[in-house]
């Protein structure tokens, strides 16, 4: 069947080659790799000593590392990694030059797997729609890093949570959605979330910042409890959501030529 739009990858005489960005434990990279260990890939990282890099080396995969803290401090005299601008783009250009040298060409797909740097506009434009990321929530509704989308879903009264694999563009996790995980019911945490939900209802809380503010005013430590519970739920979501859909998106959908885009519309 011929897809509408432009295919992300067209299988021909070779398999998909991908680059995987890691900054921490590399568990998403593990799942992508384990789903098809034979595919050619390269790992890049801004944190040279992270577990994800060590795992890649144990697998004899080529690795590119460029410490972001040292780079920006030495090259630009900047203590904090910038989100935009020439300085930010220069880092991405340096990393991707090394990645392309290692692969002897451009990657067919770039998988951000716990890569803790926002992608700059140069990289987003150059490789769109060949960059994937996974968001720990429904990216159409709840933004933020880590546990925050889960906390926002709880405050909004959602009955379940899900994770999202999406194409990275210049927005903050607002790129076109490729696939979402099954819904993970929050009912299994009803008892642990009881006090939090009652507080939300009593104080008519609508946002995460409002929850934090009112919890501190009341001195009830529920802001700490909400964060801890959201992290616990996120861990389950990672196992039952991220680890299921990310490898599937890479190997079963894109690598087999089953995905195309027409603008922001995914086919």
Give the predicted meaning of each segment.
Residues 1-267:
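One-carbon transfer enzymes
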């Amino acid at each position: 069947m011929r897809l509408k739009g432009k295919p992300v990858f067209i299988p021909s005489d070779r398999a998909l080659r991908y680059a995987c960005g890691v900054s921490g434990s590399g568990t998403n990279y593990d799942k992508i790799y384990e789903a098809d260990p034979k595919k050619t890939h390269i790992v890049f990282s801004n944190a040279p000593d992270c577990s994800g890099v060590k795992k890649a080396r144990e697998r004899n995969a080529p690795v590119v590392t460029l410490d972001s803290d040292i780079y920006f401090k030495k090259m630009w005299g900047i203590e904090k990694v910038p989100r935009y601008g020439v300085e930010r783009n220069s880092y991405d250009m340096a990393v991707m030059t090394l990645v392309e040298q290692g692969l002897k060409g451009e990657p067919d797909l770039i998988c951000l797997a716990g890569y803790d740097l926002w992608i700059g506009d140069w990289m987003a434009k150059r490789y769109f729609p060949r960059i994937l990321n996974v968001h720990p929530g429904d990216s159409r509704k709840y933004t933020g890093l880590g546990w925050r989308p889960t906390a926002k879903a709880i405050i909004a009264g959602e009955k379940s949570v899900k994770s999202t694999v999406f194409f990275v563009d210049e927005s903050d996790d607002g790129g076109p959605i490729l696939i979402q995980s099954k819904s993970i019911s929050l009912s299994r945490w009803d008892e642990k979330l009881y006090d939090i939900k009652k507080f939300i209802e009593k104080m008519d809380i609508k946002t995460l910042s409002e929850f934090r503010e009112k919890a501190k005013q009341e001195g009830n430590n529920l802001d700490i409890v909400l964060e801890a519970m959201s992290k616990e739920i996120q861990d389950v979501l990672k196992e039952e959501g991220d680890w299921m859909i990310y490898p599937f998106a890479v190997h079963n959908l894109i690598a087999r030529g089953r995905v195309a885009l027409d603008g922001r519309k995914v086919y």
